């Protein structure tokens, strides 16, 4: 082989190597393209797949197995408001399908899969648990529906007042919903108020001690004489005269002589329990008494204090408000009557308008004891002011707290023109004067003393030295309280104002403020 042939052979070998390299690259590119095409085809097949339908399993309609061991079964399902009988896939065991569970239907409406129970959906309140396990549930508008329990829920204990979520078809209760947080409606506290902190209410305190404290602390004697303690006490009278303080002091006093520790005070504002949704107020009442029973179970004395009771338990059929009282009052009475077996629960109500409370609440056997907490007289006012105006305060020289209290109370209770608030006209057309003393309360007395203390603080800031509380500051405080009370009468409704303040209720037809 000559040199020319060798060069030709080398050139051909080089060309062959290049072609092989290109061929290898083309093979790799073709392989990648094939993989991409396969992936794209799979994606297209997935996108082209028919939609599947969610439904709620109701029951297995039929199920049998042929001679070849193949299952032939159908199921009743609900998709929204639509009920259907559909086949069950042969590879899905019909006996494992549970009522209330979510199932998937393919494009041919065949049950192909069972999912977990849905945890979402409309929330309903349980009104009643039927003997066969079905539930009577209601929505916020009071519309009642009869539903079955899902397989999971059927194993749990359910009672009236519980909340459940229901499926879209409104045929199944799926699961329990945690109760609402109603802690803001019920204030639970251990009060530190004692009867010694309350002035001017000795008679009322003695009566409530006899009615409440004595049965708790002398149970053996009550049993010996076959005497049952009262279920409840109603404190009524004009506002600001110590009804709430008395209730707190009772809860505190009940702990004396017991081994259970301090008493528990559950404070409820009547208007806060009113709810526009039917059944919600009743649920809150049940919740309050349930909590009282829980606290009383360990031996602690429990006071359920319902303030402004007239707003919650109005006389049924009066037309003063909506018909909500027709259901709230019976629910309250049911719970109150149920407290009979509990030795540690006492209901105390407070109201400015006893005339608006349903008579069934006030009858013997329920709120047995009714105590009027009236406006303080001169003697009671002196006892009240002693708690707020003491010798420990910076007082004017050569004068003690007792002397200042006497001057202050005499000024407030003066029956002369400089304390003349207005004239009121009764239903006979007779006019009579109303003085500051006629509308004074324990809260007003405290407010007057606080005004004088505030003046002293401001004066101390201005002068740079502690200002003394004297007759002048107290007189200024009374003048300001008198002026604000008089101005508030300008737009007052005569009948409502007289009822709230206990001045000839129902008879006042006109108010003529002093100019």
Curated annotation (Swiss-Prot):
Kindly give the SUPFAM superfamilies that the UniProt entry links to this protein.
P-loop containing nucleoside triphosphate hydrolases
The organism's place on the tree of life at top rank: Bacteria
Per its record, what are the GO molecular function terms? Answer: ATP binding; ATP hydrolysis activity
Q: Which residues bind ATP?
A: 240-245
Q: Which residues form a coiled coil?
A: 2-49
Q: Which UniProt keywords apply?
A: ATP-binding, Coiled coil, Nucleotide-binding
Kindly give the InterPro entries that the UniProt entry links to this protein.
AAA+_ATPase, AAA_ATPase_domain, ATPase_AAA_core, ATPase_AAA_CS, NA-bd_OB-fold, P-loop_NTPase, Prot_ATP_ID_OB_2nd, Prot_ATP_ID_OB_N
* BP-aspect Gene Ontology terms: modification-dependent protein catabolic process; proteasomal protein catabolic process
Taken from the UniProt entry, a GO cellular component term is: proteasome complex
Q: How does it assemble?
A: Homohexamer. Assembles into a hexameric ring structure.
The family note in this entry says:
Belongs to the AAA ATPase family.
Q: Which HAMAP family match?
A: ARC_ATPase (MF_02112)
Could you tell me what this protein is called?
A: AAA ATPase forming ring-shaped complexes
Q: What is the lineage of its organism?
A: Bacteria, Bacillati, Actinomycetota, Actinomycetes, Bifidobacteriales
Q: State the encoding gene.
A: arc
